[in-house]
């Protein structure tokens, strides 16, 4: 990465969430380069309106970890009922988390920006359509997979 981009990175773990957000806001207010990089916890409860957030990059679809004992018990219950736990539990849960992550970008009617999804499963797997359909009515551009 170019040095100016690296210098502008604020990475989760390099400080408290609050400290990183305050530094990000300060940099933007002063016209400096700032890129806030975080994991799933940054997709919830984060309010960065206007120029504080113009691009959200989602690296992977937000499916829950499959070895969680509570999720396993719920999945077993659904299977015992003859239902499909992946499509009835996992996909709707991931859709909700995806909407929350995209919601970091658009906080009011004047906000605009770009959401980039890097996980190709959104277009290559059958459940990808359900995830896309759960999102607000964004313009959708799908780049060719390489």
Regions found by a protein language model. Give the residues of each.
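ASCE RecA-like P-loop NTPase motor cores
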Residues: 1-146
């Amino acid at each position: 990465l170019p040095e100016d981009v690296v210098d502008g990175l604020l990475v989760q773990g390099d400080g408290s969430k609050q400290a990183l957000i305050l530094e990000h806001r300060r940099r933007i207010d002063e016209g400096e380069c700032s890129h806030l990089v975080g994991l799933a916890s940054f997709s919830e409860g984060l309010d960065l309106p206007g120029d504080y957030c113009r691009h959200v990059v989602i690296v992977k679809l937000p499916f829950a970890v499959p070895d969680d004992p509570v999720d396993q018990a719920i999945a077993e219950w659904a299977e015992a009922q003859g239902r499909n736990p992946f499509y009835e539990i996992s996909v709707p849960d991931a859709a909700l988390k995806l909407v929350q992550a995209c919601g970091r970008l658009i906080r009011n009617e004047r906000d605009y920006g770009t959401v980039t999804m890097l996980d190709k499963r959104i277009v290559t797997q059958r459940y990808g359509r359900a995830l896309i359909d759960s999102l607000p009515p964004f313009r959708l551009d799908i780049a060719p997979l390489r």
